[in-house]
Amino acid sequence: VAETPVAVTGATFDLEQIQTGVQNSVDGCYDTANNKVVLVYSNAGTSEYLYYVVGTVTSESIVWGTPTAASSVITEAVCCCYNTTEGKIVAMGKQSSRPKVFVGTLSGTTITWGTTPVDILATNGIWSESKLVEWPGTSKVVWASYLSGTSSHAAVGTISGTGTGQTSSWGTAQAIVSDGYNSSRFHSMCYDAGEGDQVLLAYKIQASTNMGFWVRACTLSGTDISLSPTPLQVSSASTPAGYTPAIAYDPVNSKAMMVYTVDISGVGNYGYSRVVSSSGSTVSVGAETNFVGSGTSTQQCKQNWRSLAYATHTSNFVLCYENYDTSGSVGMVTTVEISGTTPVWSDDQATFNGGEIRDGNNVVIYDPDTTQAVLAIKGSANTLQSGVYRVAGDVPTSNMTATNLLGIAAGAISNTATGTINTWGSRNEVQTGLTIGSDYYVQEDGTITTASASPAQLIGEAITATQINIKDYTG
């Protein structure tokens, strides 16, 4: 089935206040089973408890449910991710000086959480600047966090249980500084889908030696994360800015984009970017490329930690950032794409907030179902606000019809490779989680679900949890 690219112009829309009170920390993820955006946060207006809110994205807007407490305990430095295999939200925050993990399942706009949070590491301290990412294809997640005054740590957690018994168990936490480098901060992490079973971990070091920005590949095995490869110094800046860097993965190019900010004395916070490549557990980077923004000083870019997301429909990245020049601070959004080993910045920047976006509390969550990005920020009034950004670029549109739909691939087929297609009268045996006896339809994006609304096309009936009889198969 062919796809024709259609040009779409990016746009931003009015911000909506989600929560009053001073916003302390926020993170978000997308629940692909329920097609919902989930934010977890800590806010002075809700006693600094761990709260969540669920949003439904429509065309150019988002409708939020009721903010609800996940835990009535003071919580700081939150982060979260979605685990597709388990269909669960995983949230972490510092409670009573420990990194605590909560596991929950979404239904409608309500999350049922396990009642007993788990310590990742039984060490008291000021845990902050944390990150959680999914280990795709497994029931696991990967965590990294900064512990003030000592080493940062990383670990692998396994998700299990149902209802109030949802929980996590954790492998041995590894010190990120075990290779002799100083304590890492502002961790940003993405899964390395091209290599598989490893994450790319970016961070900054702000100490007397080894200052600057770093990236490393961390291999995953069982419940272990390996930090043995030597990290690569991306920038040796003597004054790396706070609330940066950001890293996200492009599965089309099998590379990652890394954006970081350097505090240049007398000038301001200047943004830079590099493309990160991996071969096994060895990483390399392309040439450093200046960030391109707007205003009197186009390289001004700050508050961009956690605010870089990959947009699958356009194969580019969305970046939310704060720009500062002689006219003052404003919240802006733009896009960047990978060309070879070079970042290519868009010349289209949009203002979505007429004041500061503060303290790194700015998150971008991409919604693949509406092909829009959700921005959650700490605005100039210090409150939690959100907006929706329609990502500019070429959006593929399908020409699929009942007559040109041939069948289902019998397995994964790489680009330019050949493979077997199960056509009419045959059986496809590589599905998962099917409901026996239900009709299944191919959607416009190539996914297979029970949704029958046009332009979806009937492909066949599930005869087992893993098999579909394609149209008139009678075997």
Model-found features: residue ranges?
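Conserved core beta-strand positions within WD40 beta-propeller blades
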Residues: K36, K88, K140, Q198-L200, ...
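Beta-strand initiation motifs
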Residues: P5-L15, T58-T66, G108-T116, G161-T172, ...
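Extracellular receptor-binding modules and their adjoining Ser/Thr/Gly/Asp/Asn-rich linkers
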Residues: V1-T20, N24-G28, T32-N34, Y41-N43, ...
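Short loop/turn motifs that cap or connect beta-strands within the blades
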Residues: T12-G21, T66-V73, T116-N124, G171-Y181, ...
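Extracellular carbohydrate recognition
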Residues: G268
